[in-house]
Swiss-Prot record:
Residues 1-102 are annotated as: Disordered. Residues 92-102 have a biased composition (Polar residues). Disulfide bonds: none annotated. It comes from Bos taurus. GO terms for biological process: apoptotic signaling pathway; autophagy; negative regulation of autophagy; ribosome hibernation. Associates with ribosomes; inhibiting translation. Interacts with eiF5a (EIF5A and EIF5A2); inhibiting translation. It comes from the Eukaryota. This is Death-associated protein 1. The modification Phosphoserine is found at S3, S49, S51, S91. The gene is DAP.
Length: 102
């Protein structure tokens, strides 16, 4: 098969159609012109704004102050698993195997 002529490209929805190989469609990525990229970058620089202020957090009607209210050491203690005071071992069981009669 020959490739389509360079001068005339058939486009669908502003881009060339997907190529079909082995029963599956393969999309071919084509780079866009560099002019539009530069224009978009200029627009992005004009519209950049500082990040919005963080909302204040209320806990039980009082403003939370972050780590000052809950120090990391207190949070670490709350997440630790308590240790058992008595070491419990499972009670020994006698195994009874069912055998057929003679």
């Amino acid at each position: 098969m020959s490739s389509p002529p360079e001068g005339k490209l058939e486009t669908k929805a502003g881009h060339p159609p997907a190529v079909k190989a082995g029963g599956m469609r393969i999309v071919q990525k084509h780079p866009h012109s560099g002019d539009t990229r530069e224009e978009k970058d200029k627009d992005d620089q004009e519209w950049e704004s500082p990040s919005p202020p963080k909302p204040t957090v209320f806990i039980s009607g009082v403003i939370a102050r972050g780590d000052k209210d809950f120090p990391p050491a207190a949070a670490q203690v709350a997440h630790q698993k308590p240790h058992a005071s008595i070491d419990r071992h499972p009670s020994p069981r006698t195994q009874h195997i069912q055998q057929p009669r003679k």
